[in-house]
Amino acid sequence: MRQTQCLLWLFVLTCSLAPYGASQRRDPLNAKEIDEMREVADYPDKRLELMTGFARGRIASIEQLSADPKSAKDRPAQIHDLLQDFTSLLDEIDDNIDMYGSHKTDMRKGLKLTIEASSEWQLQLRKLKQQAPPEELGQYSFVLTNATEAVDDTAESARKELQTQNELAKDKKLNKTYSERPD
């Protein structure tokens, strides 16, 4: 009887905390960035360019935090959050590559930009890992590893899609905008 009550109490507690954990996930984009993304919904090159710029901004913020001795107190938490945002942006880039690629929408310029940026990001993340104080690195090493893997995945998917797009372009089978796609 007592064991059943404990299990029931544990179940109720778990169910009541589940929505709290789910609501803690942050949107990596601010309101202005979201509006910018909406404006270019039919233009994959521009979307990839924007998202790449947003991701570069997160990396630049991480580099500024790392160099600022005044931010030492809460720097690990801020870097952790920025790395999570960066990884979410890369996941969004991958989703866009998949979506626009499946509809044969031309995004070769954006893919090239993403591939170039991926090389930069790999170097910047490696530098962060090497130069971070060990006591700080321990607080965000997991998300740093996730971010590094996400960069590798994004670069690989962008390269594959660019190759596919180049082949489709030879046969003139690419749509200029997403709205031209055959449904």
Question: Which residues does each predicted region cover?
Answer:
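Bacterial N-terminal signal peptides that target proteins for export
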Residues: M1-W9
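Bacterial N-terminal signal peptides
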Residues: L8-S16
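Long, charged/polar, soluble alpha-helical segments
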Residues: A22-D183
